[in-house]
């Protein structure tokens, strides 16, 4: 049944796209195709009086947008209604809204991985015809100013197993996150511990820092809940650096590679790191708990999004503001700096394909991914990982974000090997959730005799999940 469902969804998406190309559009709801025109037709007040609904994940990026919504409403005459939900149940709420096909949500906050499920299901409006339409896009928008690897990660051709970077532009970036080591520099200095550069160093440091500030304090914060979000930050970054991969295409099929020596060795190390240097509450740790513990001097180090630590370091953000510094990705034995890889996460704005207010929705996305807004959000809005080159190179940005100890330097060191290291496929969330369950079982139970046994069973489970995917090269 799965194969039939996927094929049908892809066909519906293709048909909808073909139909959208026929004829001009008089209003947002008449057709999927945005109206055509010239630059003289563009006016920020063109959709005055329209009301749009926006769904946000609770995050610094969305907090910055929300702060500027009154200015957007004044500039455009568009009324914005919004909700902001913690990540722990945000995507459940979003999925319910999108799957209803009611069009109640016009714009939503999402990540790059969601594209692989949402786009084939018909939940996303391709943005290319909006971006390239001078009647709908301000002449100063400058799409080419986006960092190519970041905006390209939100392009996909709807073919399972194919890498991102080709196909439609399904969303536009609010900010991107690479994953690396951050640490409390004051604590490490007081304890006489050097910043870990290798995986051996990291394990020794995490063990030595257990209980560094009393009962309940620990060496390193990493995510641990039984859901997909546990896999993509620190774990996947080290997984890729180790030389492992999740899937390969063989004879037109996706084949899971989690039983490789590299995958087993890396996972075995990760389990040991958590057991010997992690939190006793690791199984409940999300983005929020990891960052909060670093900022509260409960964790001495963290392997997570660079911005997660940044949000706890600017003035007044946490008890340890100003004491946090950044490093890169620890290197396994035999690896060099050139081998260091970091997995990308990209918070983005997307348009619901069922929206009845698509032009107004595009105005919202355009405004909150514009150079002007992103210069503000990257400096005064505490959204440090800007996706725009002009902002990243600006004196204002460097002057503010550059105050964070080794923040920009660590990003520069990892940027060339920052990528999405997962294989795009529509069962991504089912697979990574199963992966996280296995990881949690290895840490918290005696279900498996060894990491090797667990990973070999996981390989079998994931092969079954993706068995119906056929890839035509």
Per-segment meaning from a language model:
Residues 340-342, 404-461:
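C-terminal capping/gating helix-and-loop segments adjacent to ligand/active sites or protein-protein/ligand interfaces
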Residues 33-46, 115-178, 325:
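Hinge/lid segment of periplasmic solute-binding proteins
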Residues 74-75, 79, 99-100, 167, ...:
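Extracytoplasmic/periplasmic substrate-recognition and gating elements
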Residues 1-52, 74-75, 460-473:
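Short, low-complexity disordered leader/linker segments with a strong preference
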Residues 206-208, 249-283, 325:
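Glycine-centered hinge/linker elements that transmit conformational signals in sensory
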Residues 70-153, 186-197, 291-293, 297-301, ...:
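Extracytoplasmic "Venus flytrap"/periplasmic binding protein-like
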Residues 44-46, 128-149, 224-225, 242-265, ...:
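Short, solvent-exposed loop/beta-turn-alpha elements that line the ligand-binding surface or hinge
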Residues 157-174, 179, 203-255, 271, ...:
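Extracytoplasmic/periplasmic solute-binding protein
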């Amino acid at each position: 049944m799965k194969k039939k469902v996927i094929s049908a969804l892809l066909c519906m998406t293709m048909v909808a796209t073909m139909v959208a190309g026929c004829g001009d559009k008089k209003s947002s709801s008449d057709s999927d195709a945005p109206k055509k025109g010239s630059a003289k037709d563009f006016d920020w007040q063109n959709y005055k009086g329209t009301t749009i609904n926006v769904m946000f994940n609770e995050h610094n990026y969305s907090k910055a947008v929300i702060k500027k919504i009154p200015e957007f409403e004044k500039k455009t005459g568009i009324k914005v209604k919004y909700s902001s939900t913690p990540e722990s149940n945000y995507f459940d709420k979003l999925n319910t809204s999108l799957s209803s096909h009611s069009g109640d949500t016009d714009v939503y906050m999402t990540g790059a991985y969601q594209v692989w499920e949402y786009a084939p299901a018909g939940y996303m409006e391709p943005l290319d015809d909006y971006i390239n339409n001078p009647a709908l896009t301000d002449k100063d928008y400058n799409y080419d100013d986006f960092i190519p690897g970041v905006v390209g990660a939100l392009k996909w051709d709807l073919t399972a197993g194919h890498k991102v970077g080709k196909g439609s532009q399904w969303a536009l970036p609010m900010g991107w996150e690479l994953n690396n080591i951050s640490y409390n520099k004051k604590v490490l200095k007081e304890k006489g511990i050097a910043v870990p550069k290798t995986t051996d160093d990291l394990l020794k440091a995490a063990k030595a820092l257990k209980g560094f500030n009393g009962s309940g304090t620990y060496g390193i914060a990493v995510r641990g809940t039984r859901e997909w979000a546990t896999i993509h930050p620190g774990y996947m970054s080290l997984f890729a650096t180790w030389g492992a991969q999740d899937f390969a295409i063989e004879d037109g099929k996706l084949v899971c590679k989690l039983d490789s020596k590299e995958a087993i060795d890396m996972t075995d190390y990760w389990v040991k790191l958590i057991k010997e240097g992690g939190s006793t509450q690791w199984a409940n740790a999300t983005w929020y708990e990891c960052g909060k513990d670093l900022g509260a001097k409960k964790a001495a180090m963290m392997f997570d999004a660079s911005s997660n630590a940044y949000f706890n370091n600017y003035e007044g953000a946490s008890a340890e503001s100003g004491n946090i510094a950044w490093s890169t990705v620890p290197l396994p034995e035999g690896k060099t700096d050139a081998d260091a890889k970091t997995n990308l996460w990209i918070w983005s704005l997307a348009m619901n394909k069922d929206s009845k207010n698509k032009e107004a929705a595009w105005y919202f996305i355009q405004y909150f991914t514009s150079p002007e807004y992103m210069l503000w959000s990257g400096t005064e809005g505490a959204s440090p990982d800007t996706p725009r080159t002009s902002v990243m190179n600006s004196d204002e940005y460097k002057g503010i974000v550059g105050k964070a100890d080794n923040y920009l330097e660590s990003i520069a060191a990892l940027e060339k090997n920052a990528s999405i290291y997962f294989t795009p496929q529509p069962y991504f969330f089912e697979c990574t959730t199963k992966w996280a369950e296995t990881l949690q079982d290895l840490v918290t139970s005696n279900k498996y005799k060894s990491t090797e046994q667990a990973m070999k069973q996981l390989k079998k489970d994931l092969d079954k999940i993706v068995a119906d995917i056929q890839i035509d090269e």
